[in-house]
Amino acid sequence: MALLELRNVIRRFGDFTAVDNVSLSIQAGEFFTLLGPSGCGKTTLLRMIAGFDVPDSGQILLDGQDIANTPPEKRPIHTVFQSYALFPHMTVADNVAFPLKMSKVAPAEIKKRMEKALEEVQLSRFTHRFPHELSGGQKQRVAFARGLINRPRLLLMDEPLGALDAKLREDMQRELINLQKEVGITFIFVTHSQDEALALSQRIAVMNLGNIEQIGTPSAIYGTPANRFIADFIGKINLMEARVTQISNTAMTLEINGLGTTVLPPKKEIQAGDQGVIAIRPEQVAVHALAKQAEIPHAHTGKVLDFLYVGDVTTYVIELDSGIQIEALLANSSPGRARFFEVDDPVIVSWPQEAAQFLVDRP
């Protein structure tokens, strides 16, 4: 049985439906992420799990018991917010111990569990400091320690890394993964950052307009997106309009606007005449000098419009002879070499046939 199960959960605010008939299940010990753009309903869903909001209909089951109308203080759930929510007049030790003091736990037990929680987040030396004496990352770890001290069944995190700089955010991601493995508590993480979701999660639910578009592992979400929205939202991708012209038990022939035909394996739900897009990730696009054209099958000629050098990789924007623009991501493998091609260089682009996916448009 799943630790947490949502069944047909709906939440409306007037005429606006923030969460639209959402169902999902989360296993014990899982690191699960709700990912989506601003306004997609992910925070509203998290608030209903926490008990800060109540669904208009549907069930929220924890260990098989419906808690949709249970007050937040009666749920074995803790929430960590982006703002840390630390008491400025309390030391680190007192901030972490606060939930146990409110529960009237014995002082000796409080001290033992407080020290254990701070050890788990590597802050044992900071017990007597106040929040204003801590860095952003240290404050966030205090918030995590306070969330874990009661050993909740679920730890909910509402964009907890959003206020940190890029380097600190990356460090905290590693610490969160290790912390979750160590304590074994189910983490539910809310973010609009695709990179955070892919780096942290065992499974991801991608939300849009109050609906869950796809649930899967990071590699499945990134590698086999269910539709155009997910393909475009998760990482960079090239999308080219296409139409299915023929389909059989063994092959599906597509006409790509401006690029001719390509053949892909068939899919059960796709029929001849279906419109959609061919999706190809930039890192799957190869770029060659024009002189190699005869050696490369299924190649397309064009010229470099622009490039972005970021140290380890360079992203090229290439305009094909047909007018279609393609992005390609190339590793800067040669030491000290900033890039391979210049603006206006004539080039050839190609990609493995198996790298292309057809995503059908559905109403």
Curated annotation (Swiss-Prot):
Subcellular location: Cell inner membrane
PROSITE patterns tied to this protein: ABC_TRANSPORTER_1, ABC_TRANSPORTER_2, POTA
Binding sites annotated in the UniProt record for ATP: 36-43
SUPFAM superfamilies associated with the record: MOP-like (SSF50331), P-loop containing nucleoside triphosphate hydrolases (SSF52540)
One Pfam family cited in the UniProt record for this chain: TOBE_2
A molecular function (GO) term: ATP binding
GO cellular component: ATP-binding cassette (ABC) transporter complex
Cited InterPro entries: AAA+_ATPase, ABC_SmlMolc_Importer, ABC_transporter-like_ATP-bd, ABC_transporter-like_CS, Mo/tungstate-bd_C_term_dom, P-loop_NTPase, PotA-like, PotA_ATP-bd
Domain ABC transporter: start-end pairs: 4-234
The enzyme's E.C. designation: 7.6.2.11
Catalysed reactions listed for this entry: ATP + H2O + polyamine-[polyamine-binding protein]Side 1 = ADP + phosphate + polyamineSide 2 + [polyamine-binding protein]Side 1
Similarity comment text for this entry: Belongs to the ABC transporter superfamily. Spermidine/putrescine importer (TC 3.A.1.11.1) family.
Oligomeric form and interacting partners: The complex is composed of two ATP-binding proteins (PotA), two transmembrane proteins (PotB and PotC) and a solute-binding protein (PotD).
Function noted in UniProt: Part of the ABC transporter complex PotABCD involved in spermidine/putrescine import. Responsible for energy coupling to the transport system.
Protein's name according to its UniProt entry: Spermidine/putrescine import ATP-binding protein PotA
Organism: Nitrosomonas eutropha (strain DSM 101675 / C91 / Nm57)
